[in-house]
């Protein structure tokens, strides 16, 4: 069976939404019964985004196999059913690292190592190797056509048409068609120049997807078709919409999936997008609104919490409520009035993070939620600060802290993971990184099994006793100090396979106060939601009703 390759590039400006378009197209092709996967090619020289600042790069998306990847992989998993792995994200840094290792081993037999053929051959081999079991591989090329960083990737995908046959390769170019308000015109010239730039590299796009503030009319499509040498049927108008989950429907309405199937000579049934129609319907017809506060330290760039934001919206869909999100800088809570800043919230969520900055503000938010019976959801560090707060103010451990912040505190209720060996059979896997900064030396990454206590609120929401969730942390609850905390009313309701780690906590004397060491947001999708997020939003709705009633 031949694999069909679809390459998606972007031009004119960055941030046009290549990831959303790629994922949306993949979802439509998947709905036609095709086995689909996506690979993101990133031009940055970092090996992975694991140590990049969330304020600069956005969130790090964790795959089931423990890879720290680009946030676009989160989009892919939310749109299609195929789970991403470390092989679905390839960076320039990873490529160069592998090429240099091969050179040092002598694999190139003394050849002068160059971009062409060695780097481009590595890229092509990566794509071919990791797409063998699929009908269609979509490849999103990061960056913008014309950037020097993207040239090796563009050369590699140009060569793919020769290596795997032009009939099994298709090039999609995403461009901007700006609207000039003074003249009331859509301008196609930037698109023409972007295609010209792509042609200079040797790539003739087969499909143009044109982003704009307005619907691109018939005359503009004819003009783009003529000057860019692309069929008019293959000029797709993609105007701004209020929901990214409308994109699959918009692509299907313009016949893009049918055009692609005919191009590849694929005989498959029409896509059934009824589930996406339901998502959009629920989004457009909410029964009410709840307000959730996200207390974080990276709020200058909300993409740092992309999966959390999406998971909250998914939970809103399942509850038929619109979720209004308020971002609260954790540092501000340390100096300003907590009551004023958190007033009017129906629920408080504290997401993950690293480092001491803003931690005391997060602790104050957990205390405020606990004392005022406001639904609280702590994720990773958010769980840890909830435990620290409870230990300090309920148990009486005034000096309680994490050894991440205070190494010699009297009550290290959160301490570094130590003494466990890395295994490959899901027994509390610890990833040991050699020759890197100490901050990543003992990171627990990827999907792990968790056993839930029967009858707990968490177990009732999941509806089962064994779950698999994704982790990214190197500090854990100190079991030796937890018994006293649990006796005071903060229970451990989820444990790792060998009971080495407490993964979930619940506050007994609170309507909904839950902390998870794992990151449930990475398993949430618009069509299914996630049990913890759905339960959290439901609790926020109940809290709102209670406040209104009183």
Curated annotation (Swiss-Prot):
GO terms for biological process: 'de novo' CTP biosynthetic process; pyrimidine nucleobase biosynthetic process. GO terms for cellular component: cytosol. UTP binds at residues 14, 187-192, 223. Keywords: ATP-binding, Glutamine amidotransferase, Ligase, Magnesium, Metal-binding, Nucleotide-binding, Pyrimidine biosynthesis. It catalyses: UTP + L-glutamine + ATP + H2O = CTP + L-glutamate + ADP + phosphate + 2 H(+); L-glutamine + H2O = L-glutamate + NH4(+); UTP + NH4(+) + ATP = CTP + ADP + phosphate + 2 H(+). Disulfide bonds: none annotated. This is CTP synthase.
């Amino acid at each position: 069976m031949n694999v069909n390759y679809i390459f998606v590039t972007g031009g004119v400006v960055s941030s046009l939404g290549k990831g959303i378009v790629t994922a949306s197209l993949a979802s439509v092709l998947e709905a036609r019964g095709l086995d689909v996967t996506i690979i993101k090619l990133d031009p940055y020289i970092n090996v992975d985004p694991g140590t990049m600042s969330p304020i600069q790069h956005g969130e790090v998306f964790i795959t089931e196999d423990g890879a720290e990847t680009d946030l676009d992989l989160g989009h892919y998993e939310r749109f299609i059913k195929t789970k991403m792995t470390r092989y679905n994200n390839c960076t320039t840094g990873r490529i160069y690292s592998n090429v240099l290792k091969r050179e040092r081993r002598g694999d190139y037999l003394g050849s002068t190592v160059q971009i062409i053929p060695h780097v481009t051959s590595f890229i092509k081999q990566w794509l071919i190797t990791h797409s063998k079991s699929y009908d269609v591989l979509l490849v999103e090329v990061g960056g913008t056509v014309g950037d020097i960083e993207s040239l090796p990737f563009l050369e590699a995908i140009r060569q793919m048409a020769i290596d795997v046959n032009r009939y099994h390769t298709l090039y999609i170019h995403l461009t901007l068609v700006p609207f000039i308000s003074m003249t009331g015109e859509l301008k196609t010239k930037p698109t023409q120049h972007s295609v010209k730039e792509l042609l200079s590299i040797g790539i003739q796009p087969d499909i143009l997807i044109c982003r704009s503030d307005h619907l691109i009319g018939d005359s503009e499509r004819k003009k783009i078709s003529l000057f860019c040498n692309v069929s008019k049927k293959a000029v797709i108008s993609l105007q701004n919409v209020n929901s990214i989950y409308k994109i699959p429907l918009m692509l299907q309405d313009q016949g893009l999936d049918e055009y692609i199937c005919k191009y590849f000579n694929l005989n498959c049934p029409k896509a059934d997008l009824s589930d996406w129609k339901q998502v959009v319907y629920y989004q457009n017809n909410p029964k009410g609104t709840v307000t959730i506060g996200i207390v974080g330290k990276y709020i200058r760039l909300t993409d740092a919490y992309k999966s959390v934001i999406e998971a909250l919206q998914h939970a809103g869909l399942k509850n038929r409520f619109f979720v209004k999100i308020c971002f609260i800088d954790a540092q501000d809570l340390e100096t300003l009035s907590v009551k004023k800043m958190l007033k009017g919230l129906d629920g408080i969520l504290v997401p993950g993070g690293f480092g001491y900055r803003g931690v005391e503000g997060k602790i104050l938010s957990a205390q405020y939620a606990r004392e005022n019976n406001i639904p609280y959801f702590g994720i990773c560090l958010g769980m840890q600060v909830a435990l620290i707060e409870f230990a300090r103010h309920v148990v009486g451990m005034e000096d309680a802290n994490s050894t991440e912040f205070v190494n010699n505190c009297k009550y290290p209720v959160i301490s570094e993971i130590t003494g466990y060996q890395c295994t490959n059979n899901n027994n509390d896997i610890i990833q040991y990184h050699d020759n890197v900064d100490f901050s990543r030396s003992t990171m627990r990454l990827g999907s792990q099994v968790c056993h839930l206590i029967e009858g707990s609120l968490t177990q009732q929401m999941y509806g089962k006793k064994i779950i698999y969730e994704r982790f990214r942390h190197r500090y854990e609850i100190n079991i030796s100090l937890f018994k006293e905390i649990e006796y005071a009313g903060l229970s451990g309701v989820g444990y790792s396979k060998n009971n080495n780690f407490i993964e979930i906590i619940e506050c007994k004397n609170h309507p909904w106060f839950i902390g998870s060491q794992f990151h449930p947001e990475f398993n949430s999708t618009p069509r299914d939601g996630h049990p913890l997020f759905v339960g959290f939003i439901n609790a926020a709705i109940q809290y709102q009703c209670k406040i209104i009633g009183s």
